[in-house]
Regions:
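Short, intrinsically disordered, charge-balanced linker/junction segments flanking boundaries
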Residues: 1, 5, 225-228
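Divalent metal-coordination and catalytic microenvironments
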Residues: 10, 21, 42, 65, ...
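Active-site mouth loops of central-metabolism enzymes
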Residues: 18-31, 85-99, 159-166
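A cross-domain feature marking catalytic cores of carbohydrate-active enzymes
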Residues: 22-24, 49-50, 78-82, 115, ...
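Divalent-metal coordination cores built from histidine and acidic residues
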Residues: 32-140
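Histidine/acidic residue-rich metal-binding segments in metalloenzymes
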Residues: 95-185, 192-213, 222, 226-228
Length: 228
């Protein structure tokens, strides 16, 4: 006899689902309320990029997100935002450079580098961005490369960036897969790419071991209505 026996007659047993890329802040909910909605649909692990709160509060905002989820019954991980501020000419609450990011490396729950939105910076060897890629070179590097293809995509992939969640068509996703980038199929509130991509996956009988699902940005009302 085990310490706890569960009668699973006529029930399904599934592993917990993983939301591989999301931004809690865009739901306009606190971490505990957002996580409760995800848990209700069987999601037990969140991989987040808290760049919204980081744009306002810097490292303190990221540390808050980690601390606010520490006692929750969910596995919560952070990809440190790579583009704070989002563009060089913006006035944000802080500038999150490689030196500031280094302070977060030892924190429990920090996995790697958040979505690298500065595609021109990667392709043109921007020194500040290369310093961030170097800092996280032994960790997971998330990408953000909408409609990128050809030699530019090859250059982006050569930087070590491993994932992308911005594909809106199967042809785009397939080219990125062939470049060695894992595809996170996005089905959120603003962007819904599942139908377009999954048809190609099924039609081409693709090996899906380098594919996963994510929401990116999804509102609580949508999660309650249709799941995550």
């Amino acid at each position: 006899e085990g310490e706890r026996v569960i009668d699973a007659t006529n029930k399904y047993i599934l592993p917990g689902f993983i939301n591989t890329h999301c931004h809690i802040e865009s739901s306009m909910a606190t971490p505990d309320n957002y996580c409760a909605e995800e848990l209700a649909w069987g999601v037990t692990t969140l991989i987040t990029d808290p760049h919204e709160i980081a744009n306002v509060a810097g490292n303190k905002g990221i540390e808050y997100m980690l601390e606010a989820t520490r006692a929750l019954p969910i596995n919560y991980y952070v990809q440190v935002p790579s583009c704070v501020p989002a563009t060089p000419f913006e006035h944000a609450g802080c500038v999150l450079d490689a030196e500031a990011m280094a302070e977060l490396l030892s924190l429990d729950g920090v996995l790697g580098l958040g979505e690298v939105m500065n595609v021109p910076g990667v392709l043109n060897n921007d020194s500040s961005l290369l310093a961030k890629l170097e800092l996280f070179k032994d960790r997971i590097l998330d990408g953000h490369a909408p409609l990128l293809g050809g030699k530019a995509l090859q250059g982006y992939a050569a930087s070590g960036i491993e994932t992308d969640h911005e594909s809106i068509s199967w042809s785009e996703a397939k080219e990125k897969l062939r470049a060695g980038i894992a595809i996170l199929v996005r089905e959120g509130s603003a962007s819904r790419n599942l139908a377009a991509i999954i048809q190609g996956v099924v039609g081409d009988s693709v090996d899906t071991r380098r594919m996963a699902f994510c929401t990116d940005d999804k509102h609580l009302a949508d999660i309650r209505r249709e799941g995550t």
